[in-house]
């Protein structure tokens, strides 16, 4: 696993790396490269996080720089669910259409099944991470 993080402080970089490593272990993902960019994502895109797939082993996660520690952990967990979906072939972008678990969808929204999975699991994994490692040292 290789993680490259840009656009934030050493303290946040350390937290981002720790959450990604935790999620890689929890999701049993191996031989994955993740590039993380922290920026004014919400101002520009009205989103706190994005995950895009370069191929089944290379991913870009974009994170908004204004997220507090709790939100940052939850958002990384959410985006890592998408990494798992892409890496396992559950989620495939076909031009502007999306193939999820062999069903073709015309578009994506927060109510899409792959987003529902990510929203449901982000809380479970974030709570487990916080219960294991705490967040006080990162705030």
Where are the language model's segments positioned?
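Hydrophobic or amphipathic, alpha-helical segments that drive membrane association/targeting
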Residues: 1-8, 34-44
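Short, aliphatic-rich beta-strand segments
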Residues: 2-5, 57-63
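Zn2+-dependent metallopeptidase catalytic core
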Residues: 11-32
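Short alpha-helical functional segments enriched in proximate histidine and acidic residues
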Residues: 26, 83, 87, 121, ...
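Catalytic zinc-binding patch centered on the HExxH motif and its immediate surroundings
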Residues: 37-60, 69-70
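Post-HEXXH active-site segment of zinc metalloproteases
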Residues: 70, 86-117
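Active-site recognition of the HExxH zinc-binding catalytic motif
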Residues: 74-86
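Long, well-structured alpha-helical subdomains associated
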Residues: 115, 122-139
């Amino acid at each position: 696993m290789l993680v490259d993080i840009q656009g934030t402080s050493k303290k946040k970089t350390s937290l981002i790396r720790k959450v990604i490593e935790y999620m890689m272990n929890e999701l049993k993902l191996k031989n994955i490269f993740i590039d993380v960019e922290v920026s004014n994502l919400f101002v520009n895109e009205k989103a706190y996080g994005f995950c895009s797939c370069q191929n089944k082993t290379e991913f870009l996660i974009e994170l908004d720089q204004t997220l507090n520690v709790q939100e940052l952990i939850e958002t990384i967990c959410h985006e890592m669910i998408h990494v798992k979906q892409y890496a396992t072939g559950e989620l495939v972008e076909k031009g502007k259409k999306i193939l999820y678990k062999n069903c073709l969808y015309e578009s994506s929204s927060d109510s899409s099944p792959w987003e529902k999975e990510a929203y449901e699991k982000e809380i479970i994994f974030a709570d487990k991470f916080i219960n294991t490692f705490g967040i006080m040292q990162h705030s």
